[in-house]
Amino acid sequence: MDVNLAPLRAWDDFFPGSDRFARPDFRDISKWNNRVVSNLLYYQTNYLVVAAMMISVVGFLSPFNMILGGIIVVLVFTGFVWAAHNKDILRRMKKQYPTAFVMVVMLASYFLISMFGGVMVFVFGITFPLLLMFIHASLRLRNLKNKLENKMEGIGLKKTPMGIILDALEQQEDSINKFADYISKARE
């Protein structure tokens, strides 16, 4: 299946005003996780543009440390995803505690980068855009178009770069299973 980049959402849709933002229910982790995954899929191109601008500014100020940090993060992330697919205990951890999995990757990257120097470049250049994405995805309420796009991604009608990343983190399987359960209940 072809991978398509999601369209760039309008600024008033991406950041519409305080009425479309709400604090997530921290007691219901699955609902919060669903909101984050849905928003990451729907606004992925906007997140990419914001991250690229921030990374470009930091990379312009300190290019060597930025490249070094990027290489280390990609290698650590790839290593953890590979290990999680080959080791059952890591696979269960990644599935049950996705936030902890991402935090372990970030901490491992931090320690490797601190051995080479340039920790602050990593923090501001790579981690800060990720933090902003997570905060926006957590607080932004979903609209009907967002939910429809996510269902199309979930059942395989569309494939996007963020969908591939979330599949690697095994964050879309649950939504596909829920959708399949819904269809089977609707048939009955």
Curated annotation (Swiss-Prot):
Residues 103-117 are annotated as: Required for homodimer formation and heterodimer formation with ARL6IP1. It is found in: Endoplasmic reticulum membrane; Cell membrane; Cytoplasm; Cytoplasm, Cytoskeleton. Ubiquitous. Most abundant in heart and brain. In the embryonic brain cortex, expressed in neurons and astrocytes. Induction: By methyl-beta-cyclodextrin. It is a multi-pass membrane protein. GO terms for molecular function: transmembrane transporter binding. Regulates intracellular concentrations of taurine and glutamate. Negatively modulates SLC1A1/EAAC1 glutamate transport activity by decreasing its affinity for glutamate in a PKC activity-dependent manner. Plays a role in the retention of SLC1A1/EAAC1 in the endoplasmic reticulum. This is PRA1 family protein 3. The lineage of its organism: Eukaryota, Metazoa, Chordata, Craniata, Vertebrata. The gene is Arl6ip5.
